[in-house]
């Protein structure tokens, strides 16, 4: 339970997105199940969420073929005091998150975290919760672009070079007021919209989102070259 400066306690639900297929990795199993310090990669974020005093409930999303494994894993780790649901993922990340949202009956704030992003820090959660208020519907972690970005056409011809000072590379966690997030996903379902992150959907319903500057080491394990960060 999170208490803001007004001392109003808010219930916080943490969604761990662990249903990715990891196609770009060319591995025998999804990247979130890679070994990291003797545990599956997803456990790094799951453990932090379980131990964070501000988080009340946890929902884990995983692939259909890994549902039984995830249940047994959480049983062995005694995590079901906080883990309320283990949900089957959809064909796209957005559909997976919506599957989890539909399980939530009573909460105020939702935190969404990629299971393949193992370097989650408590400070990201604390800072995100602090800035959610009447004027802010969501908080997302990100870092400034260090490289110049080019916009190209389908033939690889450069069309434009945006000012990188205005560009942010977005990470997770992404934190939202629950009702706003739910409304955004409902809108996406009704209009058949598919976005690459939850913040994009909240933006589409005019939600106000603030950036919290994170760290460059908060990477998502996505391609083979990223495996060196796990050593």
Curated annotation (Swiss-Prot):
<keyword id="KW-0414">Isoprene biosynthesis</keyword>
<dbReference type="Pfam" id="PF01128">
    <property type="entry name" value="IspD"/>
</dbReference>
<dbReference type="GO" id="GO:0050518">
    <property type="term" value="F:2-C-methyl-D-erythritol 4-phosphate cytidylyltransferase activity"/>
</dbReference>
<feature type="site" description="Positions MEP for the nucleophilic attack">
    <location>
        <position position="164"/>
    </location>
</feature>
<keyword id="KW-0548">Nucleotidyltransferase</keyword>
<keyword id="KW-0808">Transferase</keyword>
<comment type="similarity">
    <text>Belongs to the IspD/TarI cytidylyltransferase family. IspD subfamily.</text>
</comment>
<dbReference type="InterPro" id="IPR029044">
    <property type="entry name" value="Nucleotide-diphossugar_trans"/>
</dbReference>
<protein>
    <recommendedName>
        <fullName>2-C-methyl-D-erythritol 4-phosphate cytidylyltransferase</fullName>
        <ecNumber>2.7.7.60</ecNumber>
    </recommendedName>
</protein>
<dbReference type="InterPro" id="IPR034683">
    <property type="entry name" value="IspD/TarI"/>
</dbReference>
<feature type="site" description="Positions MEP for the nucleophilic attack">
    <location>
        <position position="220"/>
    </location>
</feature>
<feature type="site" description="Transition state stabilizer">
    <location>
        <position position="24"/>
    </location>
</feature>
<dbReference type="GO" id="GO:0019288">
    <property type="term" value="P:isopentenyl diphosphate biosynthetic process, methylerythritol 4-phosphate pathway"/>
</dbReference>
<dbReference type="InterPro" id="IPR050088">
    <property type="entry name" value="IspD/TarI_cytidylyltransf_bact"/>
</dbReference>
<comment type="function">
    <text>Catalyzes the formation of 4-diphosphocytidyl-2-C-methyl-D-erythritol from CTP and 2-C-methyl-D-erythritol 4-phosphate (MEP).</text>
</comment>
<dbReference type="InterPro" id="IPR001228">
    <property type="entry name" value="IspD"/>
</dbReference>
<feature type="site" description="Transition state stabilizer">
    <location>
        <position position="31"/>
    </location>
</feature>
<comment type="pathway">
    <text>Isoprenoid biosynthesis; isopentenyl diphosphate biosynthesis via DXP pathway; isopentenyl diphosphate from 1-deoxy-D-xylulose 5-phosphate: step 2/6.</text>
</comment>
